[in-house]
Structures are given as structure tokens and as C-alpha cells.
A protein has these predicted regions:
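Active-site rim helix/loop that mediates acceptor-substrate recognition in acyltransferases
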Residues: 1-11
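A conserved beta-strand-loop-helix scaffold within acyl/acetyltransferase catalytic domains
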Residues: 12, 17-34
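Conserved active-site alpha-helix within GNAT-family acetyltransferase domains
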Residues: 22, 65, 73-88
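A short, internal acetyl-CoA/4′-phosphopantetheine-binding micro-motif in the GNAT/acyltransferase core
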Residues: 41-48
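Conserved acetyl-CoA-binding loop-helix of GNAT-fold acetyltransferases
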Residues: 49-62
Length: 88
């Protein structure tokens, strides 16, 4: 599954069988601290339960860590993912 970061739409996206799934984010900087706020995850209904949301989340977390962002999981899926995998 290919996931790309769409800077214009502030999302990590994948296209499967012509259906787009995405993890939305916002970037903020407060007091010199860079933050990435993961705000919403959407997976096309026919692709749910197949690891798409996890793959999008993993891509977003990897990007955040590689670029020195503090992670703020506003999206319930991302928050639950981090609770299940505290090392991620």
C-alpha cells in the first residue's frame, strides 16, 4: 500500500481500488515547540478492518518523529492506536 503525504490537504493518503482513505493533521508551533495534531482518520467502508487506518497512522507517526514534532492525537483512532502501542 502506497501512502503519501499531501501537504496541500494536510493529510496522509492512500488510494485503493479508486477509493481514497486519509489521516488528517494540522501543524502548530507554540513557544518553539513543533506539534502535529492528528485530527481525523477516514477509511473507505469497503477497506475497513484491513489495516489501512493502522498503516496511515504508522506513516503519520513516522513522519512526526523524523521531523521532531510533538504528537497530539485528537483523533480517537490515533489515540487508541497509541494506547495499544505505547512504544510507537
Amino acid at each position: 500500500m502506497e501512502i503519501r503525504r499531501n501537504e496541500k490537504n494536510h493529510a496522509f493518503e492512500t488510494l485503493i481500488d479508486g477509493k481514497k482513505s486519509h489521516l488528517d493533521y494540522e501543524i502548530q508551533e507554540e513557544g518553539g515547540v513543533k506539534k502535529i495534531l492528528f485530527t481525523h482518520t477516514f477509511v473507505a467502508p469497503e477497506h475497513r478492518g484491513k489495516g489501512v487506518a493502522a498503516a496511515l497512522t504508522e506513516a503519520g507517526l513516522k513522519y512526526a518523529r523524523e521531523n521532531g514534532y510533538e504528537i497530539v492525537p485528537l483523533c480517537s483512532y490515533v489515540a487508541a492506536y497509541l494506547d495499544r502501542r505505547p512504544q510507537d
